[in-house]
Amino acid sequence: MSKFDEKVAMYVANAKELGLKIPTELLTKVAKGLGPSIYLTDASLVSGSDAEEKARVKNNFLIKKLGLADSAELDKAIDEATAAMGTSNRNKHRAIVYALLVMKFKKESLRLSDLMINGHS
């Protein structure tokens, strides 16, 4: 099993442990879009309590990648996605948070190239 496959398997297992129903195909697509950042501890996690981090998720993913208009609904969706992973959970994996956001805004049909983060595939 490749390191990438191990990461995706970890995301799938973590999502199941949390009771989140995220298709494996979507987690795989999002993880590929995140590129090498999934292997970097800090970059692979989202802090639900850090305002700067939430702004990055909003601007770099929801607005730039998913093509959504800036609104309070985006902030609420980020809060909901991080809360779904547990408020005391310190390992909020970016791939899972992003997958939850993709599902929330019904953007599952986007091509992988649309989800690429920082030019990574």
Annotate the PLM regions.
Residues 2-55:
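Core of compact, soluble alpha-helical bundle domains
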Residues 2-3, 50-75:
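An acidic intrinsically disordered interaction segment
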Residues 7-16, 70-89:
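Short amphipathic alpha-helical segments and their helix-coil junctions
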Residues 15, 34, 38, 65, ...:
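Generic structural signal for hydrophobic core residues of well-folded globular domains
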Residues 22, 45-49, 65-73, 84-93:
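Short acidic, glycine/proline-enriched loop segments that cap or flank alpha-helices
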Residues 25, 29, 33, 76, ...:
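Amphipathic alpha-helical interaction segments
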Residues 50, 110-121:
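Short alpha-helical "patches" and their helix-cap loops
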Residues 81-115:
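Amphipathic alpha-helical binding modules
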